[in-house]
Amino acid sequence: MTPHINAPAGAFADVVLMPGDPLRAKYIAETFLENAQEVTNIRNMLGYTGTYKGRKISVMGHGMGIPSCSIYAKELITEYGVKKIIRVGSCGAVNMDVKIRDVIIGLGACTDSKVNRIRFKDNDFAAIADFGMAQAAVQAAKNKGIDVKVGNLFSADLFYTPDPEMFDVMEKYGILGVEMEAAGIYGVAAEFKAKALTICTVSDHIRTHEQTSAEERQLTFNEMIEIALESVLLGDSL
């Protein structure tokens, strides 16, 4: 047990899917996993372990922002022996080549947060996904006939930015999606010798102001989860 996770030793699989919303974690467990059991619920940050096509997999919420997700990712890795974390969440698009409902695989994550500079002695740290995990996710998407975009995300410290001109800079540098956690999770994984990947669904477009409906989000969210789960199986065979 830790101050933030009340699961017993051995409660988590070596691979954990992590949405921000704990209710999405519950949905994933109930919809996609067999024999799913709740293993933690402190602060209502729900976590479950079950099986997917016979493979033991866990799912747990991580909350909003780098500080929250970093706590859970670190404790899962160092206290529960988790080897791989797949963040599954939503993001906003700033690039006109990206459309709502697109699925993005985040090879890297830029950020305005200073957490990785703190851990990297005030130098820039290239926050990147594990290549094998990204490769497996791309292949899983191809196998299911789902188009994905692969590239850089931007992990923002502020949801309500005071500097909207920054979106112009993001677009110039080819950022595919804006979210709030990937750079932190990649930094934690690097520090503690684990592996991580972020897969996001575009829920809204910052430029066009388009938004997905609740029904549309659910459908595309399911595609993202299927990619993540199938990538775990493919990763086992690589």
UniProtKB/Swiss-Prot annotation:
Pfam families registered for this protein in UniProt: PNP_UDP_1 (PF01048)
Subunit structure as annotated in this protein's UniProt entry: Homohexamer; trimer of homodimers.
Annotated site location: Important for catalytic activity: 217
EC id: 2.4.2.1
Entry annotation: catalytic residues: 204
Family: Belongs to the PNP/UDP phosphorylase family.
HAMAP family in the cross-refs: Pur_nucleosid_phosp
GO biological process per UniProt: purine nucleoside catabolic process
GO MF term list: purine-nucleoside phosphorylase activity
CDD domains: PNP_EcPNPI-like
Name of the featured protein: Purine nucleoside phosphorylase DeoD-type
Residues holding a purine D-ribonucleoside: 4, 179-181, 203-204
InterPro entries from the UniProt entry: DeoD-type, Nucleoside_phosphorylase_CS, Nucleoside_phosphorylase_d, Nucleoside_phosphorylase_sf
Catalytic reactions of this protein: a purine D-ribonucleoside + phosphate = a purine nucleobase + alpha-D-ribose 1-phosphate; a purine 2'-deoxy-D-ribonucleoside + phosphate = a purine nucleobase + 2-deoxy-alpha-D-ribose 1-phosphate
Keywords, sorted A to Z: Glycosyltransferase, Transferase
Source organism (scientific name): Histophilus somni (strain 129Pt)
Sequence positions that bind phosphate: 20, 24, 43, 87-90
GO cellular component, one term: cytosol
Role this protein plays: Catalyzes the reversible phosphorolytic breakdown of the N-glycosidic bond in the beta-(deoxy)ribonucleoside molecules, with the formation of the corresponding free purine bases and pentose-1-phosphate.
Coiled coil: none
